[in-house]
């Protein structure tokens, strides 16, 4: 079937894009131990959303032994899902590392144009969430590339400071 890569026009372009996709996904897989290091353990996998049959989407986490986490979101419907919100484990900025809608793979390059910042809202049992644009029939993998300070840490630090200021006022 290698002769299909030599076809001219749209058919050849599709086959070359598919080849580029498999080369990229294999390289991505090897470069990200979150996808394979704990492959046979529930410690390496966690559902975010497994039951959204109305939107035909799923979302899950993959983790490595060091605790590094990737967020995968799949849209199995032929409809754009703009404003799709999922809970995430860490407050911060999330960057799309891999998208099946990439033009290099024959996609249209839709989805999130840049990094997405989490918001402190409850979603899927987590205290923070990101809102994404999911192209139809696509999957995307995100990673928290910049963590925000914990809200709990700030309130825990504020209590001793408040106690000190109360003593100083007396």
Q: Which ranges hold each PLM region?
A:
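Carbohydrate-interacting/catalytic domains
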Residues: 1-170
